[in-house]
Amino acid sequence: MTKQIQVDLGERSYPIYIGQSLMSDGETLSRYLLKKRILIVTNETVAPLYLKQIQDTMASFGEVTSVILPDGEQFKDLTHLDSIFTALLQRNYGRDSVLVALGGGVIGDMTGFAAACYQRGVDFIQIPTTLLSQVDSSVGGKTAVNHPLGKNMIGAFYQPQIVIIDTECLQTLPAREFAAGMAEVIKYGIMWDAEFFQWLENNVQALKSLDTQALVYAISRCCEIKADVVSQDETEQGVRALLNLGHTFGHAIEAEMGYGNWLHGEAVAAGTVLAAQTAKSMGLIDESIVRRIVQLFHAFDLPVTAPESMDFDSFIKHMRRDKKVLGGQIRLVLPTAIGRADVFSQVPESTLEQVICCA
């Protein structure tokens, strides 16, 4: 059974399809690809698994070619973005082009940003193959590449035409990548939906064993929340900032440790625990809530402490470059209960230092 969710953004609205064997479903894709020139962007890990399958599905719609990039967050940069532009220009692709992101969050972010920039904007489609990209980065139109001084600092808001989530891709996903995706799944429960958080607590083994029904429910619920938030606040002027729970600390970990050494979801897990500990220090939540958050991350084999090599100074230098900083003030998304969060703009650095040093 295929589930459909709509992201309501007026003229830029688009559907999300969630189910099995969707990469072979030419009927769903046909309206977006007919008489188009198609460039599939993927990586060296995904290409041997799924590239031929998706090429065969799309071959009847128009000219299909591909570009295969290295796999990893450390390659999400301007140099490898240029490889996509070169592939388009060498083939004389015009505004009738459609870019297809076949891969995880790195591929989706880069392909979307390339689509936003190429000839001032061409269509693109998201086909996310990792749990993290299925529940988070493929939905909402955030596209970007990293800079050595900060994560996702060069980018644009640019919405896809459609998101195709084929749950069968998760059967080939390494366990570490699956766990990293669960960090974002858990995040939705903490910041938005207490019932969903409790459901996750009760369904750890079903999810870890890749039970299809459990996966479809978890992915669908995350996409419903993301679609709701994005429909209210496309460009992150308000409520969408709550989706960054754990990310200010997490991005600091990724940048300090070197992109690719910690997976994004791993950094988000540790960052969310730091956010919860900060909230406890400020009297926003009690120890029992912190304990539930830590236990659920731990159940999915995720890190719940920051790297030992990182001290307060190494965190704060990156946190001051965070995109949410306003007027020089670090703004943090902190949980105020299971199922609720808020943005706080005046968190004392002394509190942050105490939390980081004691973590």
Curated annotation (Swiss-Prot):
Chain positions recorded as Zn(2+) binding sites: E184, H247, H264
Molecular functions per Gene Ontology: 3-dehydroquinate synthase activity; metal ion binding; nucleotide binding
Binding site for NAD(+): 71-76, 105-109, 129-130, 142, 151, 169-172
GO biological processes: amino acid biosynthetic process; aromatic amino acid family biosynthetic process; chorismate biosynthetic process
Cofactor(s) recorded in Swiss-Prot or TrEMBL: Co(2+); Zn(2+); NAD(+)
Pathway noted in the entry: Metabolic intermediate biosynthesis; chorismate biosynthesis; chorismate from D-erythrose 4-phosphate and phosphoenolpyruvate: step 2/7
Organism superkingdom: Bacteria
Enzyme class per UniProt: lyase
Record keywords, A-Z: Amino-acid biosynthesis, Aromatic amino acid biosynthesis, Cobalt, Cytoplasm, Lyase, Metal-binding, NAD, Nucleotide-binding, Zinc
Compartments, record wording: Cytoplasm
Family annotation (Gene3D superfamilies): 3.40.50.1970, Dehydroquinate synthase-like - alpha domain (1.20.1090.10)
Catalyzed chemical reaction(s): 7-phospho-2-dehydro-3-deoxy-D-arabino-heptonate = 3-dehydroquinate + phosphate
Enzyme nomenclature, EC number: 4.2.3.4
Cofactor: binding comment: Binds 1 divalent metal cation per subunit. Can use either Co(2+) or Zn(2+).
Name of one Pfam family that matches: DHQS_C
GO CC field: cytoplasm
Entry keyword Nucleus: no
Function noted in UniProt: Catalyzes the conversion of 3-deoxy-D-arabino-heptulosonate 7-phosphate (DAHP) to dehydroquinate (DHQ).
Record-stated family: Belongs to the sugar phosphate cyclases superfamily. Dehydroquinate synthase family.
NCBIfam families, alphabetized: aroB
Name of the protein: 3-dehydroquinate synthase
Organism in which the protein naturally occurs: Shewanella sp. (strain ANA-3)
Gene giving rise to this polypeptide: aroB
